[in-house]
Amino acid sequence: MMELRVEHLCKRYGENTVLDDISFTARVGVTRLLGPSGIGKTTLLRVLLGLETPDSGTVNGDKFRWTAVFQENRLLEGLDAEGNLRFVLGANYNAAAQALLEELGLGDVGKKRVRDYSGGMQRRLALARALLAPSDALALDEPFTGLDAENREAAMRAILRAAETKIVILSTHEELPIPVPCQIIEL
């Protein structure tokens, strides 16, 4: 069974302690990091992914193939939606990828370049790219930012499908209804 273990994690920036003795275990399904802006949710995700080193504690995040969506979408702005997905998926781009674009409301954007998308459209495309990339675990930093209620619901459905087979670590500062049991880590 896949299991992400975080034990006594601490992270400081100078005199500022951002993560203080964080411990949890995450398995296939959704683990939600909940807390106000600036509390350390993004820092924790970056430590899990190995992008930052903790000052103390352990995490076995390097045991997994991760995909991530951070607050910056990091898309290829000169390409359209399909081009962004093909860049990640290569020959594995298929009907399922196109269906996910449709589900997330991006099926009718044609050859419009990503740089011309709204912020919400870019967010949904970044999420689609992460959901489709081969991985064991997803790190989703505020994945619903800029989404209206309808698109938020579509994104949630897609995330929950991924959580059937992957570890999903989802950060949010809002109390969002997640229609399945999930672990909540309050920071």
Q: Where would I find each of the regions flagged by the language model?
A:
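Q-loop/switch helix immediately C-terminal to the Walker
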Residues: 72, 78-92, 96
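Walker B catalytic motif
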Residues: 113, 142-143
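ABC-family nucleotide-binding domains
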Residues: 141, 148
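Conserved ABC ATPase "signature" region
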Residues: 94-109
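Conserved ABC ATPase signature
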Residues: 113-120
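Helix-to-loop junction immediately C-terminal to a conserved catalytic motif
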Residues: 49
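Conserved structural motif at the start of ABC-family nucleotide-binding domains
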Residues: 4, 18-21
